[in-house]
Amino acid sequence: MDIGKIDIPESSGVYLMKKNNKVIYVGKAKNLKNRVSSYFNRVHESEKTNELVKNIEDIEFFLTNTEIDALLLENNLIKKYSPKYNILLKDEKTYPFIKISKEDFSSIKIVRTTKALDIKSGEYFGPYPYGAWRLKNILMKLFKIRDCNRDMKKTSPRPCLKYYMKSCTGPCVYKDIKEEYNKDVENLKQVLKGNTSKLINELTALMNKASQDMDFEKSIIYREQIKELKSIASSQIIQYERELDEDIFVFKTILDKAFICVLNMRDGKILGKSSTSIDLKNKITDNIYEAIFMSYYSKHILPKSLVLDAEYENELSVVVKALTIEDSKKKEFHFPKIKSRRKELLDMAYKNLERDIESYFSKKDTIEKGIKDLHDILGLKRFPRKIECFDISNIQGKDAVASMSVSIEGRAARKEYRKFKIRCKDTPDDFSMMREVIERRYSKLPDIEFPDVILIDGGLGQINSAGEVLKRLGKIHLSELLSLAERNEEIYKYGESIPYVLSKDMEALKIFQRVRDEAHRFGITYHRKIRSKRIISSELDKIDGIGEVRRRKLLTKFGSISAIKKASIEELKEIIPEKVALEIKNKIR
């Protein structure tokens, strides 16, 4: 990844490093530019850090008002995404984690160094920049979970002092409490994941019942537990005084575009943002604010509460009334005018919106230059604004599929992607498969819908196969036919034998690489799905009592042969007779 080409903001915030659109690391920084750049400008002592840097394909930034906001957001996003590298790198060394061991009668411990983060031996929560020991003590008091090093496989002659202090139920001695103990461990984990509401409601019901039964001692215990749980929630969720689902919605119109940024708060914690834009070209509306708001929430779930700029309160008044009447669950709309937490979050949303707008126009200029370079260097008749790219995926001709990805103005247009299951059976090879898919795609496509460029993943052989079909169909003139050979990233133009070689750091080449890689990814995913179904079907065909209907039911419920292998007899019996379930267990090893 060329970090020099990324416009990194110089403010506090959180960065999400990604590979294949999956978050692999979440970090925070007082100055994002300094922190993120430091990953790329030197060789690190830690092999894991070097490995992380090699795997970074994209970085997303989330700007915050303060470093504390960044810290809170980082913790929430780590819990949301469980990124691969977060528990392995040095960034968390100064922050303790809470570890719940994976063993009979789990223990709770504080761990501080990365060396102790062995995910096979336990589940980790954190990092906690402050209050970890207090939190652990509260949890022990609430759930009576042990924190000792005693061997739980043995029975001790007597419990330790903590049993008599009522901060442990003594599993080292009393083995018959296992079921209740495990339930307490699960409740403890839910609290650490931020899910306190359900447990508080359960304890409130128990407290009220105990009070009605005149068992005031038990009622007081429940009351104190509720107080402690609320204390945990408030220390973790300091953004708000209460738990709620809320969107902080801001937008800005520039020329013929509306840019939208929404901070998503769920259960009182900010868990991410949604950034998008709406094309306003040739659109007519009496109230642009209503149109933008309704356009966004026609595709997204409307939360219980929304925060919007006070500037738009009058313009959105009709929307507010309509949504309040239409939805049986009352919606809350907030238009903060004075300094408050909601106003701070609104400012944070605007900060991210400005960043999104800057990034959009910067990227748009870069892409536009790339499109122009492709047109000029390759001598194309049209600017390559719409590209359809084809890739073939198979293993020695088996489970062969083709995929088509689409790029419009240099950006992926995923709604237009297509996949094809190859039909030709006679000595299938990549060339004949390419001929088949090109014919299926373009034989009936109206001339007006042809793309500017048809891009083939491959070299001269593949491009000539595609050209033969388009020529026979009399449609070779409708699009530029090009191919991208993966080995040296050479670009072939139909009718020419000498390839074009572009500099690897040119946006022109990257436009083709992105759409080619998308076709490859899309095709591989489809190929694996087809192959998996075939393997499952062939395995199940060996078993008496399984026909087409039962095979389909098993596939629908379990999805893979390994999942069927792992399923218990009871789970299998839900859809097939016990005799057939036993046959599956005996024959599928």
From Swiss-Prot:
Keyword DNA repair among UniProt keywords: yes
InterPro entries referenced in this protein's UniProt entry, alphabetically: GIY-YIG_endonuc (IPR000305), GIY-YIG_endonuc_sf (IPR035901), GIY-YIG_UvrC_Cho (IPR047296), RuvA_2-like (IPR010994), UVR_dom (IPR001943), UVR_dom_sf (IPR036876), UvrABC_protein_C (IPR050066), UvrC (IPR004791)
Cell location: Cytoplasm
Domain (UVR): residue spans on this chain: 197-232
Record flagged with keyword DNA repair: yes
Alphabetic keyword roster: Cytoplasm, DNA damage, DNA excision, DNA repair, Excision nuclease, SOS response
Gene Ontology MF term list: DNA binding; excinuclease ABC activity
Subunit structure: Interacts with UvrB in an incision complex.
PANTHER family: UVRABC SYSTEM PROTEIN C, UVRC/OXIDOREDUCTASE
HAMAP family found in the cross-reference section: UvrC
NCBIfam families referenced in this protein's UniProt entry, alphabetically: uvrC
Name of the molecule in the record: UvrABC system protein C
Organism annotation: Fusobacterium nucleatum subsp. nucleatum (strain ATCC 25586 / DSM 15643 / BCRC 10681 / CIP 101130 / JCM 8532 / KCTC 2640 / LMG 13131 / VPI 4355)
Gene encoding the protein: uvrC
